[in-house]
Amino acid sequence: FGNSGAEVNEAAVKLARRWGRRMRGGAHEVISFDGAFHGRTLAMMSASGKPGWDSLFAPMPQGFAKARYNDIGSVERAITADTVAVMIEWVQGEAGVNPADPGFVRELRALTTERRVLLIADEVQTGIGRCGHAFAYERFGIEPDLMTLAKGIGGGVPLAALLCKEPFNGFEPGDQGGTFGGNPLMAAVGLAVVETVCTAEFLASVRRRADQLARGLQAIVRDHGLVAERGAGLLRALVLPGDTAVQVVEAARELTPTGLLLNAPRPNLLRLMPALTIDEDDVEQALSLLRLALRAGQRAT
């Protein structure tokens, strides 16, 4: 256990490299993807594919290669004898809520298995019900070798976790840990979250609200002349025709008597991540407020 997504993502890389040293003759390089976001530690900034991060705090840790998202040929070309793992988000949140193509994911799982390369799933943003399943990998009918969780698993408190299949568990006592990781208070919260969210009834409700939200966003795209709506479960985005996302976010925050929290990871994109407990009426209210914010944002430009 850890406290943040970056912490457990870095632990996943450590574990993969430990396995590579023991089982793959010292293989250590990790392939990640253009547009990826894995955290703000130096190593995870190297693993991320966010523009400019390779020089912001240079020199950066080495041992990370990049491939193109949803391009299996790019991954295949990036694999070398030194490759120990591929690290992927099933939905790239910071890059603009870009979901992985199911066919690509299945090909990636087959390729990594064939080449004896570990598949690390960064489910910090997508896990614990966010995409309508306990874990987003369930949408693809595959399983990763290592998986990281944070954000949702803590229900608002700092809790994160690294999970792995037993054959890849090469950590020895003292290899990984932290002062507050897995402390009793946070663990109790995490257990309550998992026992509540990871039930068939709760997840079915998430999928119903996700379908409702997606339909509403598609109507907004048509009515407001936007570019597209996309996402998975209750992690969704609106693509705008111009770089007006910041203005829309500000307009949404200032709506009265109730504001609307939006996020703009890209100048032309709005990200929506409502609470998993959102009900039908709240979805409709949010969609109505979003329409108002879009009009106000357009007027501001």
Regions of interest found by a model, annotated:
Residues F1-T301:
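Conserved N-terminal phosphate-binding loop of PLP-dependent enzymes in the Aspartate aminotransferase
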